Amino acid sequence: FFALIAALGIYRELKPVNKIKVKTGENNKISWYSKSIYPFLIFAAILSLCQASLIQSIGFYITDLFGNLENLPTLISMTFALLSISTIVSQYLFTDAFPMKNFSLLMVGSILLAFSYFTMAFFQSISFYYLSIMILGIGFGMTRPALSSSLSLAQTPENQGSAAGYLGSVIPIGHMTTPFIAMPIYAINPGYLYYFSSILCLSLIHISEPTRLSV
């Protein structure tokens, strides 16, 4: 009901825009392997795998490493709360209050992700774990909006919808591949999974260079 009211309000506030017809040929069509598309899809797929492996392993990790602590369900739920809060705060700070360029958001966010995954695996204490989770939230809050914005800006107006569709289709890859990639690594050693994610995030720094992403 409230969603319907919000949709009606947004519709009433939309201003009419004169459409400009542009002749487009076959060369203007994009595909997932277009130069302006595939680097973003690779970035999104890696980011999705890192985030999905984290989400699916939080409960296991806390239980395996901090099983001697009391109120494990509370500790696990606090992890999700800290991750969500830090992500929301990061998105507000770096996209609204103190906006940064997309390239800077992608670069700094990737560095924070790599650093936090490493500290999470190396310092196996609950305090460092929570601190790493908050830094992870900041990193996710910087990279995710910058990625979608950069992809949109790299396309012509008539191709922005298709590009957004490609990006949306890649995001679930992390949850699909985590049981086959992340969990076997976790079974060997819980810390190895986060070292692996840290290495993947270092590759994001390489992918986010301006020569690869048009940001």
Each language-model region and where it sits:
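C-terminal membrane-cytosol helix-exit motif in multi-pass small-molecule transporters
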Residues: 2-20, 208
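Juxtamembrane intracellular "pre-TM" segments in multi-pass secondary transporters
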Residues: 14-41
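Short amphipathic helix-loop junctions that connect adjacent transmembrane helices
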Residues: 56-74
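Structural signature of the two symmetry-related core transmembrane helices
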Residues: 104-118
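A late C-terminal transmembrane helix in Major Facilitator Superfamily
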Residues: 159-187
